[in-house]
Design a protein with these regions (language model features):
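ATP/NTP phosphate-donor binding region
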Residues: 1-89
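Short glycine/serine/threonine-rich phosphate/pyrophosphate-binding segments
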Residues: 24, 48-51, 97-103, 122-125, ...
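C-terminal charged capping/lid subdomain of soluble metabolic enzymes
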Residues: 1-3, 7-8, 169-171, 281-363
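A glycine/threonine-rich phosphate-anchoring loop and its flanking beta-alpha core
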Residues: 12, 26, 108-203
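Solvent-exposed alpha-helices and their adjacent loops that cap or buttress functional pockets
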Residues: 6-7, 33-34, 82-85, 106, ...
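Active-site segments that bind and position negatively charged phosphate/pyrophosphate groups
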Residues: 194-302, 306
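Non-transmembrane, aqueous-exposed alpha-helical and coiled segments at domain scale
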Residues: 74-86, 246-247, 282, 349, ...
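A short, small-residue-rich loop immediately preceding and capping a beta-strand
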Residues: 82-105, 109-120
Length: 363
């Protein structure tokens, strides 16, 4: 008999609005997650701690753990804390790093996890992946998606604008990842999940053409929804493929070679722009370029603190970060001098005088 349906993992509850976090204790009770608030709250430093100060009275039975770093060691410490009491769930309050630690520990403890996001820097708020550092470098670990996602716009507005804008770069990089997935399908026979593509593309397109910005509640709602949809795309696919291609190989390479130069979302947008340049997809290159410029995101290696030679080395090293993945980088398989020529041309196009010529040509 043919299989006519399939089960899709998704959050049980999503709330994106001002004042959303005030309903956390109520959510735990209403959704039968924890009738008396016996949860372990993993807090990010800064905003996470500030939010907890407003919630502590409503959750007197909760335990508290401050996340010091997005590391496997820190996640293991949180896991040990979970063994000390019979907790009903893990609540992560903070940015992507805090949520990654909370997701990992909750998954290993077989407990539900509630994500309370204080910024929108990348799609980690709802993804089935935790990115954690370890003594050998960094790794991506498969985890359960959050049972519930809360995004309080009051706190997102207080987050550093640069961090919030970077989520735009992560969302639009889906477009490049999708192209890489189809490329792998054509040349390697890799299966493509159409529903995952639909979620990932919808997330990216929602950001690509908007003319408002992060000062607007409507824009932040759209960005939060885009990042949640990206997480859904990965859950549906059972892999990060719909949201991770050459763009993310470049991110991992830059992080390995120059770990302090920029953040995930900014590098995702830059990596996607370079990938569209390599594909010689001028219409899509122009759209992505305009979106990044509109939101003040990096479009040139120098914008993230890299010179041409450093960016070249990162691009050449990028395929080694995901040996199992086939993207435009593996497809072209350019040698050093050929790639140097492409990097130089890309730099000329995206430096200020080059941008003026591009913008004049596309009016």
């Amino acid at each position: 008999m043919a299989i006519l349906t399939r089960m899709l993992g998704s959050p049980l509850f999503v709330e994106i609005r001002r004042g959303a976090v005030d309903r956390l204790a109520e959510l735990l009770t209403e959704r039968h997650i924890s009738s008396d608030g016996t949860v372990l709250v993993a807090l990010g430093r800064g905003q996470g701690e500030a939010i907890w100060a407003t919630l502590e009275e409503s959750l007197p039975r909760a335990g508290v753990f401050v996340v010091q770093s997005a590391s496997l060691d820190c996640a293991s410490e949180l896991l040990k804390r979970l063994d000390e009491r019979d907790y009903d769930a893990v609540v992560g309050i903070g940015g992507g790093r805090t949520l990654d630690v909370a997701k990992y520990a909750a998954t290993r403890a077989a407990l539900p996890m509630i994500a309370v996001a204080t910024n929108l820097a990348h799609d980690g708020i709802c993804s089935p992946v935790s990115s954690l550092t370890h003594p050998g470098g960094s790794g991506s670990f498969g985890v359960a998606m959050p049972l519930a996602v809360m995004v309080d716009l009051d706190y997102v507005h207080r987050a550093p604008p640069r961090m919030v804008r970077s989520g735009i770069g992560d969302a639009i990089s889906n477009l490049s990842a999708i192209e890489d997935w189809y490329l792998a399908h054509r040349h390697r026979g890799e299966a493509v999940d159409g529903l995952a593509v639909t979620f990932a593309r919808t997330a990216a397109e929602a950001m690509l053409h908007r003319q408002d910005d992060i000062a607007s509640d409507d824009f932040l709602i759209a960005l939060a929804e885009a990042l949640i949809l990206s997480g859904m795309a990965m859950s549906v696919a059972g892999t990060s493929r719909p949201c991770s291609g050459a763009c993310h190989e470049i991110i991992h390479s830059i992080n390995a070679l120059h770990p302090t130069v920029s953040n995930h979302g900014e590098l995702a947008g830059l990596g996607a722009l370079f990938a569209f340049f390599l594909r010689e997809d001028q219409p899509r290159f122009d759209l992505v370029l305009r979106c990044l410029l509109r939101h003040g995101l990096p479009v040139h290696p120098a914008d993230v603190g890299l010179d041409e030679e450093q960016f070249l080395e990162a691009v050449l090293h990028a395929p080694a970060t995901r040996p199992d993945r086939y993207t435009i980088l593996e497809h072209l398989d350019l040698g050093r001098e050929d790639m140097r020529a492409r990097v130089t041309q890309f730099g000329q196009l995206t430096r200020p005088d080059g941008l003026r010529l591009v913008q004049e040509a596309t009016r």
